[in-house]
Design a protein with these regions (language model features):
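Active-site pocket-lining/capping segments in soluble small-molecule metabolic enzymes
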Residues: 178, 197-238
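Catalytic cores of alpha/beta
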Residues: 9-16, 66-78, 128-143, 167, ...
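Alpha-helix-loop-beta-strand connector modules within alpha/beta enzyme cores
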Residues: 35-62, 101-125, 161-185, 224-252
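N-terminal pre-domain/capping segments
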Residues: 1-25, 30-37
């Protein structure tokens, strides 16, 4: 089966992902920061509303992926509470100052996830920020993680498709390779053909205006340039469109003899 994971930051978006045909969600907060650890309340609420897989982002702050000992301890605690809240998996990535995968500490967190409730682990796009993508894949394999999330080190999956294919060939079934980076209904079949991927990750966020009537024109509590009266959500139809395009991958492959 070709699997679809949708990145979400709310119960509303998680429900839309399931209704649209996704197999799992990556649950985060602060998607404007690239995704941070969600609250315990949000994890529990999402878990109670959907039946598909819930994979929780474990990232204590924005910025780089070099974490202090205090931050590492927080990540361990967050993995434990994600397990208690019913998560099926966790998502994280740790690098060294030199740009390599922090194998020792990543393996420790993988074991923590496995010990807590046999949760799966996705090593996220920290791998795309590493010094050497191919050797980093081998490092992640050594940690015991179940899959990596990658765009092939490029800004989009389309641009990084050649390297993604190389990673899939190098993985040799030892670890899953999930493709991300502007995956859309109009390009997913081409990405699948170019990479051989069978797992895809997408955000598909759409802007939705706030229903707030009164808006203080003299004060803004967000970052400069941000619109506090606009939020981004996942829409069921957008997920359904991507799922339908993905379902066409198998029929295309059978016709082409791939």
């Amino acid at each position: 089966m070709i699997e679809l994971e949708i990145c979400v930051d709310s119960v509303e978006s998680a429900v839309a992902a399931e209704q649209g045909g996704a197999q799992r969600v990556e649950l985060c907060s602060a998607l404007s920061e690239g995704g941070l650890t969600p609250s315990l309340g949000l994890i529990r609420a999402v878990r109670s509303r959907i039946g598909i897989g819930v994979y929780v982002m474990i990232r204590p702050r924005g910025g780089d992926f070099l974490y202090s000992q205090e931050e590492f301890s927080v990540m361990r605690e967050d993995i434990a509470y994600a397990a208690k809240a019913g998560a099926n998996g966790v998502v994280f990535g740790l690098l060294t100052a030199e740009g390599s995968v922090d194998v020792e500490r990543t393996a420790e967190l993988v074991e923590a996830a496995r010990s807590a409730s046999s949760m799966e682990v996705t090593f996220h796009r920290a791998i795309d920020m590493a010094r050497d993508l191919e050797s980093s894949l081998e490092d992640v394999v050594r940690t015991g993680a179940h899959r990596v999330l990658t765009s092939g080190g490029a800004q989009s999956a389309s641009l990084g498709s050649a390297r993604v294919r190389g990673l899939m060939q190098a993985a040799k079934g030892r670890i899953g390779v999930m493709v991300c980076g502007n995956v859309r209904p109009e390009n997913v079949q081409q990405i699948a053909q170019a990479t051989g991927a069978r797992e895809f990750h997408a955000s598909l966020r759409a802007p939705v205006p706030s229903p707030v009537i009164y808006r203080n024109p003299t004060l803004s509590l967000g970052e400069a340039g941000s619109d506090e009266y606009m939020r981004s959500v996942v829409l069921t139809q957008d997920v359904r469109n991507l799922r339908q395009a993905m379902d066409g991958i198998l029929s295309y492959s059978s016709k082409s003899g791939d």
